[in-house]
Amino acid sequence: MLLLISPDGVEEALACATAAEHLDIVDVKKPDEGSLGANFPWVIREIRAAVPADKPVSATVGDVPYKPGTVAQAALGAAVSGATYIKVGLYGCATPDQAIDVMRGVVRAVKDFRADAFVVASGYADAHRIGCVNPLALPDIARRAGADAAMLDTAIKDGTRLFDHVPPEGCAEFVRLAHEAGLLAALAGSVKAADLATLTRIGTDIVGVRGAVCEGGDRDAGRIQPRLVAAFRAEMDRHARAFAAAPAAS
């Protein structure tokens, strides 16, 4: 399982660089603009320069409306600015067909520029609260659009969490559908260390966190701390070892 950490600017990216051995992907977002709020192009460039070259940089394009052309341009901007993972929050897409329209534009724009770019179609575990596409539709949307991964996050950051809206068995189905479609499955949404056993068991490929590695567990007021990144990774590795050993022990 890969660990994706989301700094909100260059200062926190430098903290991630200090803890680079413990993480896999540095994800650029702007939390005050939403769950998948997009940051400025120059911030993406500065963060790309700040973190080790062997660590991929991801960038969110935003909690986007159903405006395929607008979103495709934004996605290309993120790629030009140095991101290799491009995440799109399908916030304003009420139907799978709308979501596919948006994602096809993103895939073409980004991969025409950089063939090895990695495109992530992101939905929301709490989709029922905002009227967007069903979370379990995301793997098929991503597959039909030519994306590389399907992701779930939470749209409304009010203390509720991924498993509050899509229980573990639902997340397991999401992962299964993603894998059947040949995609990676990414899960986020106020994920905590206590969730890692379940996330490991269901076969999650990428776990995305912010609050769990911030002071006080606060994604907004807290700052990312290298020691908390290291501690979270240690828990990931512990659960991975335990899961790998379980069949042999049984």
Swiss-Prot record:
One of its GO terms (molecular function) is lyase activity. The active site is at 29 (schiff-base intermediate with substrate), 87 (proton acceptor). Pfam families: 4HFCP_synth. Its EC number is 4.2.3.153. It catalyses: 2 D-glyceraldehyde 3-phosphate = 4-(hydroxymethyl)-2-furancarboxaldehyde phosphate + phosphate + 2 H2O. It comes from the Bacteria. Keywords: Lyase, Schiff base. It is an enzyme of class 4 (lyase). Belongs to the MfnB family. Catalyzes the formation of 4-(hydroxymethyl)-2-furancarboxaldehyde phosphate (4-HFC-P) from two molecules of glyceraldehyde-3-P (GA-3-P). This is Putative (5-formylfuran-3-yl)methyl phosphate synthase. The lineage of its organism: Bacteria, Bacillati, Actinomycetota, Actinomycetes, Kitasatosporales.
